[in-house]
A protein has these predicted regions:
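Acidic, proline/glycine-rich low-complexity IDRs
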Residues: 1-194
Length: 194
């Protein structure tokens, strides 16, 4: 495979995360669900530094065309980041869903994906909002590859009310509410901010 595609991109993304999270364990996870098989995409899990810390899950391969598929029309691509409060394969399922929809129609900052059920058991959040990766250090937001730039997008679980608020007042207004309340998006039992 050529530079910036397939395995080369996955290797670069993994190295990018290992550099950004030195000393933390990065685990490669593939996926195969009943409804979705994408062997060119996997999830990288960054384990927390300390017990009780947050788990970071990052897609790897969504930013490049599928093998045998049409070539990329753009010189930029996106990978998606989901934060969970504990180790769970549900994060892999959710990222598979996001990557699938991204493959159908490119997801941009401000777009939402309906999960159709709580993102984690007991949560009132059943939608995922694509946002800028505010939790990551600035140098981790983008990875330059030969002929392609990979942008990392945060996937934030939100409620139906928060989704409606963003549609009505805009993403910036919703993100302002997140900031005002000190949103802990990874908390499955959090209340709606609106």
């Amino acid at each position: 495979m050529g530079p910036g595609t397939g395995v080369d991109a996955q290797t670069a993304i993994e190295a990018h995360l290992r550099h950004g999270f030195p000393g933390q364990r990065v685990v490669v996870q593939g996926w195969r669900t009943d409804a979705l098989a994408m062997p060119h995409v996997r999830v990288l899990r960054v384990d927390p530094e300390t017990r009780g810390g947050l788990w970071l899950h990052v897609s790897s391969g969504a930013s490049v065309p599928a093998p045998g598929g049409p070539p990329a029309a753009e010189s930029e691509g996106s990978e998606f980041v989901l934060v969970t409060p504990f180790k769970t394969l549900r994060a892999v399922e959710l990222l598979a869903m996001v990557v699938y929809f991204h493959g159908v129609e490119e997801l941009k900052v401000g777009d939402t994906v309906s999960v159709g059920e709580p993102w984690l058991p007991g949560s009132s959040c059943g939608h995922l909002l694509v946002s800028s990766p505010y939790l990551l250090a600035d140098e981790l937001w983008m990875l330059p590859l030969p002929g392609r730039a990979v942008h990392f997008r945060w996937v934030i679980p939100i409620t139906a009310r928060e989704r409606a608020y963003a549609l009505d007042r805009g993403l910036e207004a919703l993100e302002q509410r997140f900031e005002e309340v000190g949103l802990e998006s990874w908390d499955p039992h959090r209340s709606s901010v609106v």
